[in-house]
Amino acid sequence: MSTMTTIARPYAKAAFDFAVEKNELNQWVQMLTFCSEVTKNKDMAQLLDGAVAPEKLAEIFISICGEQLNEFGQNLIHIMAENGRLKVLPDVLDQYILLQHEFEKVIDAEIISAIELTEQQKADIGAKLEARLERKVKLNCSVDEALLAGVIIRAGDLVIDNSVRGRLSRLSETLQS
């Protein structure tokens, strides 16, 4: 686990708890997403690395974000600037989204297939994963022709490799041992 993730977690948890209390989960995702993008800007990154006073940095950051931040979002920016932590806003966003998915019982599932899946196949895979994981599943589908045939499914800690390439690899390992 990276240091940035460890630093970001308390800020994400505080923002998330506040958002739950105020019933503003999606509004906070939008604010954190916007702030995350601002920190990725080349000029802003240089400013964050510079020797700007925290209060001045917070003012600049908030003025750039404008109406994208409500007063509570601005408070978060002030606190993070005081602690020299504005650079971790992308990690705060990532941690916040993980907390939101856990709260809403949603999990992202990556489906890699050898060919493009039909809508019916996607629906079937999604339904079976939801039943198995007892969560709502958001599918992210991609194609990798190197699989030859079949699919690889990754959802949280669950990995199901039902591809021909995976089967051939396991067969090769078995024969070599």
UniProtKB/Swiss-Prot annotation:
Pfam family, one: OSCP
Keywords: ATP synthesis, Cell inner membrane, Cell membrane, CF(1), Hydrogen ion transport, Ion transport, Membrane, Transport
Subcellular location: Cell inner membrane
Entry annotated with the keyword Metal-binding: no
Membrane topology: Peripheral membrane protein
Signal sequence, renumbered to the chain: none
Main localization, broad class: membrane
One Gene Ontology MF term: proton-transporting ATP synthase activity, rotational mechanism
InterPro entries on file: ATP_synth_OSCP/delta_N_sf (IPR026015), ATPase_OSCP/d_CS (IPR020781), ATPase_OSCP/dsu (IPR000711)
Top-level taxon in the UniProt lineage: Bacteria
Quaternary state and interactors: F-type ATPases have 2 components, F(1) - the catalytic core - and F(0) - the membrane proton channel. F(1) has five subunits: alpha(3), beta(3), gamma(1), delta(1), epsilon(1). F(0) has three main subunits: a(1), b(2) and c(10-14). The alpha and beta chains form an alternating ring which encloses part of the gamma chain. F(1) is attached to F(0) by a central stalk formed by the gamma and epsilon chains, while a peripheral stalk is formed by the delta and b chains.
Role description: F(1)F(0) ATP synthase produces ATP from ADP in the presence of a proton or sodium gradient. F-type ATPases consist of two structural domains, F(1) containing the extramembraneous catalytic core and F(0) containing the membrane proton channel, linked together by a central stalk and a peripheral stalk. During catalysis, ATP synthesis in the catalytic domain of F(1) is coupled via a rotary mechanism of the central stalk subunits to proton translocation. This protein is part of the stalk that links CF(0) to CF(1). It either transmits conformational changes from CF(0) to CF(1) or is implicated in proton conduction.
The protein's name: ATP synthase subunit delta
The species this protein was found in: Aliivibrio salmonicida (strain LFI1238)
Taxonomic lineage of the native organism: Bacteria, Pseudomonadati, Pseudomonadota, Gammaproteobacteria, Vibrionales
